[in-house]
A protein has these predicted regions:
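Terminal-region recognition feature
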Residues: 1-208, 214
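Short, solvent-exposed amphipathic alpha-helical segments in soluble enzyme
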Residues: 152, 225-226
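Gly/Ser-rich catalytic serine loop of serine hydrolases
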Residues: 212-222
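Gly/Pro- and small hydrophobic-enriched strand-loop and loop-to-helix capping segments
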Residues: 227-232
Length: 232
């Protein structure tokens, strides 16, 4: 315990010492250039700085002003499900540039490397409070969470998985809507996901839909608005 407090104190001292520098010196060092990556988080609303682990423990809500930080799909899953219970499904599906949209393939490749995701949603099976559930979490870092063929397919398969095994379904939406680079193919996903949810509903199963920032366009007009319970 003593070592833990010592390590925490050292981290806080690094931040305090840098923040105490004269303005000219701060500017020269670009404010946070000497802070180890991932240690420090600055709130865009109140501009206060905090240890990243404190922000994480506060569920990504600013301890100073209550601002809600954006949450990655991976972080949200870790926050929500029982420890070590999540198992990803349909993770091998990858988007193809079927319409030959300019620079789309390059964008996908770049985002895969920077986010560690293969598209804008992560789906899987997990336990929440000991109960088995199927969960889908969108990530706005990947092309603003837009819904293309792979996103629509992954969500549809997750719904079908839940229906077949008679499991409740949780989906966290964070999307700018249908993906323009896939044209009519992306719009088809609205009908496909809605149809799968109709069957899940007909089986008398629970679907809880969570609207997170941002949730707009074709996602709002399809699966996001079809929950038995909807939270925002």
């Amino acid at each position: 315990m003593e070592e833990l407090f010592k390590e925490r104190k050292e981290k806080l001292n690094i931040i305090k010492n840098l923040l105490r520098k004269p303005k000219e010196e701060k500017k020269a060092t670009n404010n946070t250039s000497n802070i180890p990556e991932g240690l420090y988080t600055k709130c865009p609303e109140c501009e206060q700085g905090f240890l990243s682990e404190d922000v994480q423990k506060n569920f990504y809500v600013c301890p100073g002003c209550g601002h809600h930080f954006k949450i990655t799909a991976t972080d949200r899953i870790q926050m929500l499900v029982d420890k070590d219970s999540f198992r990803e499904i349909t993770h091998r599906l990858k988007t193809q540039n079927v319409l030959g949209f300019p620079n789309y393939t390059q964008k996908l490749s770049h985002l895969e490397k920077t986010t560690g995701l293969n598209d804008a949603v992560v789906t899987g099976v997990a336990k929440v409070g000991g109960y088995r559930v199927v969960i889908g979490v969108m990530d706005s870092r990947f092309l603003m969470g837009s819904m293309g063929s792979v996103v629509g397919e992954k969500i549809t398969r997750a719904i079908e998985y839940a229906t077949k095994r008679r499991l409740p379904l949780l989906i966290f939406s964070a999307s700018g809507g249908a993906r323009m680079q896939e044209g009519i193919v992306s719009l088809m996903q609205m009908a496909k996901t809605s149809n799968a949810l109709a069957k899940h509903n007909a089986a008398g199963l629970l679907y809880i839909s969570y609207f997170t920032h941002p949730t707009t366009g074709g996602v709002t007009a399809s699966f996001a608005s079809l929950g038995d319970i909807m939270l925002a």
